[in-house]
């Protein structure tokens, strides 16, 4: 065996091994030093072409005795100048070729002595071509063991499938302890009660299992540290617990699928009666393990410390890593607020979010895939309460963002609801209690995930026929720079000219764009525009409807608005010109697209009237406060419990009410935080109406528009609004007199539209534009029974 050998080759690396930055995806070649000496690899060559043995020449790298080193076939440029002097390099990047199978990988020393490996044309996903120390001349397709050479091959047993064990009672909610029996037609039953998957090393079932309230037992997963660099508060009190039984049947070389049931015994808190509960169970090592735990600082952070001597560094922890390589299998069980199990499914779980990954309570992305249970979509739609496989394959359990998770957790969801009838995509959400491996893990919002399946479900455009951008990043493998043509056109052309404005109207859905900007402005979200922006378009040529090829906007992550940052998102902040985090110190002038569009008179009128539509209806205090307090009442006990579990003594100096916070989080704290949002909703309309006139240089005055509505079944259109269900009462809004308002009437099936009576004057046309030349405009649709 030569001193330096090629010990492992990987030609497809979606989930096989990650590099020293925690990234999957690149092919790799592993080298192994079997000698007793340190070997300097300077001048050694590696290639996939026998006729060009020094395609890549190694430099300034040594390999210690018994050490394995990986050469990554990627384009990553690494600056090693900041590495600690004693750091032993185990990763070499930027090998300038890719492996696809069928080639011969050759390693050559400076004298031309070679070691070669002929790679098979095909290797199964998740497998590599490697040798063992016992047979270094014998390469086989095997499980990966990056940075380590196995002593022997381990052969997997190929097992037939037995029927899963039967439980004597179903999981669910029980007031008193219960006994759970299990039986199978053949074989031996093995089981676990801690969330771990069952193996032949698990406990053997030999009689009924008594399940009681486990809450008084010591915390296990809630007591694990190493989950955050910034805030690792762990609860000092015991947390609520349920019992997860996982069981399999084994008979010789046969095994059954895992049967999972969750038992909630003695948990009677009001928080469990108002909102649904989700149980997530998965291998503890997949959550908190050093190498592969997605909730942990883990190996990625350890390597970063070894390299640089620094523990901190954005992105350098297991929980920061993305992609399917950092997805772990889990069992999801969903219970209604009435404690009925509505569905269960094996799914994939990843950590979700940006900076919020640093928190002790992390968000989760949930994926339905046929590799887990044969389903490529969720088998139940919690938003419509419908069974059967649909098209949604991605959901998210959100904590509420990196700051809002420690307060009300409802700001984002609130504004998504308020804007849900507008021309922007909004995410439906359901507040849920979550248990993780049997321990209470706090309040989450189960939300739709901005993804290609979201666009398909809501707009009917297939994933292969759409381009989707989120946070200025193209999702999946779509056209690079797909939105650049819109921005370039806006920057280079004078959009005040009709022909140029008409052209950009063919590129973007103007109302969708307006509704996105107006919602972000009004909510006071400082983390918008350059960051939390989503948009999509169809790529089908010559289509109509949503297939017309125009860009449309998606709304997400409004967590830091509505007064959460007193100086940036308070009710009195002029969000048209200040408060934004991302360099747009004056968004209406510095945001390239909006600044170009607002120069056009038609766009300006449409924006102003649409904005006032939202002020008068969607975001009006009468409407928004009812929704807020309904949400607050439903989540009250759950949010307080969640904050007591995760918040500890944490305060935010940018949120002025925290000056009065004394832990633990209490009902008074919750009511205070809800009142901050309530005050924002009460005051925001007045401030933004005033800023609208000043910042957009309006010359007119505010006019009261009153629509007197008779009892007939009809709906009234006011600009972009459709007013329904206002029988027998008046609707009131305020608009600037700079622009007329547009009226229309849909009289319904049982009445006839006869015209309008406006300040005593009658008009016969249904669709009309009314100038606002009086301080009060009284409008009455004239209707007659058929």
Region spans (language model):
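Short, solvent-exposed loop/turn and secondary-structure capping segments
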Residues: 18, 57, 81-84, 117-118, ...
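Short, compositionally stereotyped local motifs that mark structural "simplifiers"
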Residues: 5, 124, 131-321, 326-329, ...
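Short consensus segments that form the blades of beta-propeller domains
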Residues: 17-22, 95-96, 236-238, 319-324, ...
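Intrinsically disordered, low-complexity linkers and terminal tails enriched in Ser/Thr/Pro/Gly
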Residues: 1-181, 185-190, 198, 245-248, ...
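Conserved ATP-binding subdomain of kinase catalytic cores across diverse folds
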Residues: 280, 303-480
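Middle-to-C-terminal accessory/interaction subdomains
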Residues: 138-140, 144-157, 274-278, 285-308, ...
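Surface-exposed intrinsically disordered loops and tails
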Residues: 80-92, 212-235, 571-585, 648-666
